[in-house]
Amino acid sequence: MTKNCLNQENCIPIFSENSSGDFFSCNPWLLFFNRNKINYQIFSLKKNDTLLFNSSSRLYIILIGSLIITKVLRNTHKVTLNLLTTGDTFGQIELVDDNFYYEAEAIDKTEVACINYTTIIKACSNCAPFNLFFVNHLVFCSAKAYHFIEIISHKSITSRLASLLLLLAEQNGTQVNNGIMLNFTITHKILAQIIGSNRVSVTRILANLLKTKLISIQKKRIIVHSPVLLSQRILNQ
Amino acid sequence: MTKNCLNQENCIPIFSENSSGDFFSCNPWLLFFNRNKINYQIFSLKKNDTLLFNSSSRLYIILIGSLIITKVLRNTHKVTLNLLTTGDTFGQIELVDDNFYYEAEAIDKTEVACINYTTIIKACSNCAPFNLFFVNHLVFCSAKAYHFIEIISHKSITSRLASLLLLLAEQNGTQVNNGIMLNFTITHKILAQIIGSNRVSVTRILANLLKTKLISIQKKRIIVHSPVLLSQRILNQ
């Protein structure tokens, strides 16, 4: 359809769903980059490793893992902007001035692919299916930000934590016999950082949720027993 | 460059900045739709008029005015997701289930253009400059959501209100001799709705900001005298 697209027909099936086989060989972004000989870098982050970014010229794609995105206002304070997981991207935030920068902190073992943003834009104009994939991805990014807004719109820390657990259970949970188990371990300190609180408060609230049997811990992972009952806990605040 | 794009060369200058002349004749979206004979509808909303949307099949473009986007969870509560102004869009949020819907409430006289989302996607594939414009717009949408997160990440209502006034001054303000005047009048009730509070609290906090001369009111509009001093008020909470 466009003369610049060398193998458009080849790149259509890349964006079909494929959850079997080796993870990296079926990641839609990497499949597309590899088939079209597009250069990218891979960063492997351990838990608590932090990636600083203050330029909108690169796009970071989370291949696997989870990161907290934070805006750091120089000499003042930090604001947690989002919790991103496998398939999410960051880096395409505008830069206003020198008064702040962004950082991404891994909350689990995380692999990130990094690519120049101009390369992505060029790929969009050269390959219509990739362009559609990218447009849909950007719409999904806004939706993801709105999910985070639903968590922190609560003023009460108990409501924020219950909302976060519900979102994690929905997006990063696996059904087990007595509820939904989170796919990763998460420290009280990280939970506090996400919801803008402190470790002590989070430990106290989790102890209460455990006592009232709304959650339990198994193999160091949180299990949400009943999303309905937990969501009622939010409204009762 | 692509055989489907009838007048690609013509549509390039549409996306250049043009702030002179009649507003609607130089709106980039309308210019593009009109030149390419793309159908759209215009809705004129008065203050407090509400537009319900529970489908992601249409894109709404704010031609002029301001709206609050709210997620309404059936039988339970509402969450304000964002404050959108001239040039912003909404509607492209995913629909998960029947437990909620979205509404957009005008906080000022507002004109909205509405177009089928499939038409936008088709236009993207037919016209490369429009596609680039739309991709940049979607990136901007995420950034806008992050601005809102910065406001409601505060647990204190005073900090949320001060953050909101700073954002409004930056994005919807005009420099006057003694500070930055907001471009529209806004009621205490609407301010409360945006930050998840009530009218009484907002009135009390605004009275305090007036008393300490951080803001003043002129022609029913709020003037922020010093963004620096007001931002310090946030940190002191």
Swiss-Prot record, chains A, B:
Q: According to its UniProt record, where is this protein located?
A: Plastid, Chloroplast
CC per GO annotation: chloroplast
Q: Which Gene3D superfamilies match?
A: Jelly Rolls, Winged helix-like DNA-binding domain superfamily/Winged helix DNA-binding domain
Task: Cite the GO molecular-function annotations of the record.
Answer: DNA binding; DNA-binding transcription factor activity
Instruction: Write the record's keywords in alphabetical order, separated by commas.
Output: Chloroplast, DNA-binding, Plastid, Transcription, Transcription regulation
Principal location = plastid
Q: Which SUPFAM superfamilies does the UniProt record give?
A: cAMP-binding domain-like (SSF51206), Winged helix' DNA-binding domain (SSF46785)
This chain is encoded by the gene named ycf28
Chain residues forming the annotated DNA-binding region:
188-207
Under the heading SMART domains, the entry gives: HTH_CRP
**Occurrences of domain HTH crp-type (ranges):** 155-228
The organism named in the record is Pyropia yezoensis
Record-given protein name: Putative HTH-type transcriptional regulator ycf28
